[in-house]
Every structure is written in C-alpha cells, then in structure tokens.
Curated annotation (Swiss-Prot):
This molluscan globin lacks one of the heme-binding histidine residues found in most other globins. Residues 2-151 form the Globin domain. One of its GO terms (molecular function) is oxygen binding. InterPro entries: Globin, Globin-like_sf, Globin/Proto, Mb-like_M. This is Globin.
Amino acid sequence: MSLSDADKKALDASWKKLTAGADGKKNAGINLVLWMFANVPNMRAQFSKFNANQSDDALKGDAEFIKQVNVIVAALDGLLQSVNNPGQLQANLDKLAKSHVNLKIGLEFFGPLQQNIHSFIESALGVGAGSDEPKAWGNLIAAFNETLKKA
C-alpha cells in the first residue's frame, strides 16, 4: 500500500502538531504509548523492561518506560521523515517489521492499532473523524501491517 500525497501532507502536518513545544516528541510519545496501553488488547503484557501495569503517573516517572517511549518515537520519526521517499519508507517499514517479528509482536497488536489509531489522532489534534489526519495515520499503520505480513 502506498501513501497518497494527501496522506503524506497530513502525516507531516500532524506530526509537527503532535510534537510541537518543549519536550514535544517525548510528550507525544508518552501520550501515544499510554493510549495504546488503554486501547490495544494485551499491549501492556508486551513490555518486560518495566512494569507496564503501573499507573499512568508512575509510568511517566519510570526511566525504562521513557526509554521505550523514546525508541517508539524514534521509529515513528524515521517513518514520518521518509514518507516522501518511497524506497526509504519501505526500508524503514521492513526494518521495523523485522524487529517486531523478532519480538513476536505481530498483527494481533498492530491490527487493533490500525483500526483505532484514528481515535488517538482525532483526540490529540482536535479533528473530526473524516479529517485527513486520522485517515493518513490509519493508512501508515496499514502500510506497516502489509509489510509485517511479509516479514
């Protein structure tokens, strides 16, 4: 699945909005991961370097949780920086898919993420369900899931 020009534009604009301000990427990452814990079944069980069953406030103060957030943000940032270069985007998707296959994290997690990411984007950006941003994020996760199926 390739991303449309509208997807690319919406992804770029929304990532800039999500990560704006002091500690923007860190805060966006924390919000996304906490949202995933609440909205993707069994997601908390996938993390062993920190106690993912702590309260959200405790997680925000957990150094290992923050390290994982930084890893996730770096991977997302790499994908988003490459959306206008199809070859680089595919290479980044391949690398990310292989790392998740090695960790035995597959479509049972990324399928629900694809289905529900729109609600995170809508809430975080204050946009409606029919807006380009939620659609674009769903399409990005769909592209990842297609790559994950082949990994």
